[in-house]
Amino acid sequence: MISFIIPTRNNLPYVKTAISSIRKFYLGAEIVLLDDNSTDGTDKWVSETYDPHLTYYKNEGRQVGHTVLYDIGIKMCKHEIFSIFHADMICGPNYVENLLKHLKPEGVISATRIEPPLHPPGKEKIVMDFGMYPGDFKQSEFITFCRDSQENSSNKDVTTRGIFAPWAMYKEDFLKIGGHDSLFSPFPYEDSDIFQRFILAGYNIKQSRDSFVYHFTCRGHRWTEQVQKDDNFYKLCCAKNMNHFIRKWGSWIENDELCYPVIKPFYNIGFVVTNCNLQLLGALEPWCSTISCDCPEWESYIKQVQSGTPFDLKKRVFYRSAEIKNDIIVHFDASQLTQERFTFLTQLPKILLDSGDLGEMKFDIFTFFIKRMPRLESLLIHNNNELYRSRLIEIPVTDEYYTNELFRVFQNTK
């Protein structure tokens, strides 16, 4: 059997619907419900609900997000296979069976999401409106659609290559690479990080085209006040974790048309920049391993930004340093940067993969000195790898997910 891992925060109407949908088809399945200090009566509802196969965990402290709660639930679960399942999802018939028939050790299987027309269409999902909220959910129509689709030869036993929630895998394989990176707490982009690590670890990634969930979308952490309106806390989390992802991987997230991650090379790149100011330093710094610049406010930058990132900026930002020893060094004049040239820098790993050669070369305003080009991304598979940890500051025990600054800024914006 399989364990369902469901994090929640102030999402009780959706949680009730999600658990009810699972119980409709899987009375004995273990459900691990992880409550991120909700104040909506979730704990009271659980205490009044008799379900011998429901395990409940409540975080009584500050919000940690699903990044942390997923891993707590996975470690708690009793079965060797688990499924990440969002609180705003509804389980369809044969959900488990049509995942497990494709799952083997060192594999990750995603189901197919059916969603209302709130986001752009995609080849990895089905856009069909069975309701916007639990109260208007068309359950019988959804179940009929699932069963009819499962009998359709274009879906039955078919898999494609993509990964997204909900997904399932062996607990042992998840723990083998260290689980989610908790420094993406509370959310988002923790999924893209671990998906890339799954692929680099050699795990077989598939999507089952006849395992279905209905997904209301974004109700757990993004649209907490109004559908299709990102709340302010989510926006702050996005800004924090976008920079964290870029500093960690040296590039931004990219997926193909079926939502299979396109992993770019991670090179040891240093920027040597003249005519740099504080604003340009902030824009450029995340996109390289080190930056040497003539910005007179470079120390102020480190002081201002360090509280918001666990990456050690004293190892990343230097003033007119002759000690830059990166594998690849790029010199340029920041006063000549345009949006097009900045975009070129953000795509540099992919460009170097296609056309980089050892030695010195020039392109537009950029001068390259390429000593070597080892790809380092495979060193990021496990959270505790030396390459990653050596680039971080010592994380305080009083701020283990390094979110104090995030919550301070959020409080000041209220």
Segments from the language model and where they lie:
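A recurrent flexible, glycine/aromatic-enriched loop bordering the glycosyltransferase active site
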Residues: 68, 139, 145-172
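Conserved donor NDP-sugar-binding/catalytic core segment of glycosyltransferases
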Residues: 90-136
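A conserved hydrophobic helix/loop-capping motif in glycosyltransferases and polysaccharide synthases
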Residues: 2-14, 18, 25-26, 34, ...
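Short, acidic, metal-binding catalytic loop of nucleotide-sugar glycosyltransferases
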Residues: 20-29, 283-289
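Short aromatic/hydrophobic "clamp" motif used to bind/position activated sugar donors
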Residues: 82, 329
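Glycine-rich, basic loop-to-helix element that forms the pyrophosphate-binding segment
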Residues: 60-77
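A short, conserved alpha-helix in the catalytic core of glycosyltransferases
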Residues: 161-178, 184-212
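A conserved acidic beta->alpha catalytic loop
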Residues: 35-44, 90, 296-300
